[in-house]
């Protein structure tokens, strides 16, 4: 080495990240050789940048060329020296840094270099893109050293290839080829890269061979991050999930949720996010807005990455011809358009960026979505004045006023639970609940879901998005269903009502939880009754024990015994006195008679009976029983039976008794007889025989035979003498009559059908045209309005005109013209009203055109004619199929007969 070379600086240029692969030498012996080679390379680069010539004592017989690609020093000349003058001493640069320092916005020189040296190669089954391929200009020169410098603000990448240049003793002896470049971002692979025989990006180390290989940078097709090794790229692809113009580093993916970067598009409701193709429901809120596009970002890092990828060049130079994307280079634009083609969706919306498979779907999207609507293009509902930006949403809203519901189709039936669904997609989602399949997993936690909609809702809890806000209290929610449930608190709506107690709830889950309280899980082992709580069951079992003891009760006192032996032992004792015996008998009779005289309901005690009479029948128990105790008071009951006329003549005459309006307790057919129960109010004494039914009070008259025979269960027929009874006040009698009359009316009303109330058009005289129009209206109503709504308006018992007016008025149209009703209008005045039926039910441009050009009669016949024609065609097809089947059977029979 010459003195001039010895005087060169001993450190490489500033902000350089250099990595040397020098064969299979041990690492502890490479340090001196590596530093000396770095010093020589840095010296050559500094000499070339100053335009000075290299000393001839560096082996003057060989030609050394250095090429510098640096936009900051474009005026510097490329030098080629063979010897000569001394080299001035440059300023000593800063020591090399092991780690690369990433700038906020790379300089344009890197892009220029990539454009100059772009010759993609090595495309053998590569699943990524090759953006840079730096190759020596003179591959055939045996004694050529090429140095390519790609410089930005913080990094200088060197590629040096010459195994004959005398740069150091170790290098000359081993004849190694060195690649000096920026360190890969994957620091974990540094040691492996030094030991492997393949240089970064595919450049092989060749000892004693002057042929130079190319260096290739591998780029991720989703986030455009570059790698020099395929292994590093494949490892990156396991974590890179986004293709919207930015990427998430591996370290960021594994950190907590606050540091995960997500792009967002701030758009109107119902728009589609450009960055992730999600709807407005899942768009990511951000606070850092891009001044050149409608995107916003959560972190400064994601914003700077977006600026570098999208807006580092003039966005207007490379706009996408399919969507509204604008890219920074022609290469990225080409890759972006290829993604449209690979996805099979070459048609995209220019406003929201959503792409479609065919142009028809794009036109429908532009017609019915808010991408083509503005504040002036609004449609309001005539019923509730609600405003809509899309026609399909308005049509769906009007169906709610009409009562139209989506019909579940039997062809979409689950083979497991036999439930029907609206479409095949909903059926497939439902089947996953039986199979347990959950193909949609969250990338932020371990949860999995059976539907994509459920996954989108779940992601909002990670991102903290709450796009649904209450207009009353400004509280925000992540899911729309939760907002709807919250709004019912403000409106007081409780649609879920309990059938047992009548209590209402907002949610169906609340009703299901409440319904469990009405379940009776505690069943009695002695009878069929069930109870809600265990205490109620214990109380009921005590009643069974009390009744069992009452079967062995003493007739002289109130004591009861479990067995007959104990009762006999008690009676043999002889401890009862006559006074005690009388009181005991009276108490026993009172206990025996504790059933209600009005509804025949039994009770355990007289106190519960009195409470029942006060609460249920709203009467005073003393007025019902008088001055006598309940055991002494006998309810005057009689039974009547409806029998045949020939049986009535044969019945024994029973003296009539003065009674008032009664209550029909029950009337039913039992076997071959009719049993009727009736409660009659006794208004006075009479010389008649009464039927006292203590327990059941059933009077059964068989209908077969010539004479009706009477058989009464537990009935005592006594001749009751006339005697004074306690008087009842007129007020009490009036209340009794009112209560019993109401009970009788309610019982009769249950067996009557509700009369038709739509008789307003019954007296109208119809002409032949009106009759034809009336028939067509009936067919039209059946075809256009769903059966539930028709049944609500009294169809088919009500007239066609009445149902037609109710349907139209329910949609917000006032049909009354002064005091005139529809039936009072003439034939010509009815036409506009009939035309309204099409307006509120059918949203079809062709039908509207027919209404504007033809009479309403012709339009109705046209619509009905199509339906009849379709039915005729189906009938003809069915007949043809039957004829074909008949011919086939005939041919088969002929073949069988021949055989």
UniProtKB/Swiss-Prot annotation:
Q: Which GO terms describe its biological process?
A: heterochromatin boundary formation; negative regulation of DNA-templated transcription; protein localization to euchromatin; response to ecdysone
Where is there biased composition of kind Acidic residues?
A: 183-198
Extract the GO molecular function terms from the UniProt entry.
chromatin insulator sequence binding; euchromatin binding; sequence-specific DNA binding; zinc ion binding
Q: Where is the composition biased (Low complexity)?
A: 45-55
Per UniProt, the keywords (alphabetical) are: DNA-binding, Metal-binding, Nucleus, Repeat, Transcription, Transcription regulation, Zinc, Zinc-finger
Instruction: Report the stretches of sequence that form zinc fingers (C2H2-type).
Output: 218-240, 288-311, 318-340, 347-365, 379-401, 412-434, 440-462, 468-490, 496-518, 522-544, 552-576, 594-617
Q: Does the keyword Plastid apply?
A: no
Q: Where is the composition biased (Polar residues)?
A: 67-83, 102-111
The record's region (Disordered) falls at: 1-33, 45-127, 171-206, 646-665, 702-734, 865-899
Location(s), subcellular: Nucleus
Superkingdom field: Eukaryota
Parts forming coiled coils? none
Basic and acidic residues composition-biased segments: 21-31, 874-899
A GO CC annotation given for this chain: chromatin
Alphabetical list of PANTHER family matching this protein: C2H2-TYPE DOMAIN-CONTAINING PROTEIN, PR DOMAIN ZINC FINGER PROTEIN
Relate the protein's function as given in its record: Component of the gypsy chromatin insulator complex which is required for the function of the gypsy chromatin insulator and other endogenous chromatin insulators. Chromatin insulators are regulatory elements which establish independent domains of transcriptional activity within eukaryotic genomes. Insulators have two defining properties; they can block the communication between an enhancer and a promoter when placed between them and can also buffer transgenes from position effect variegation (PEV).
Q: What is the protein name stated in its UniProt record?
A: Protein suppressor of hairy wing
Question: In which organism is this protein found?
Answer: Drosophila virilis (Fruit fly)
Gene that codes for this? su(Hw)
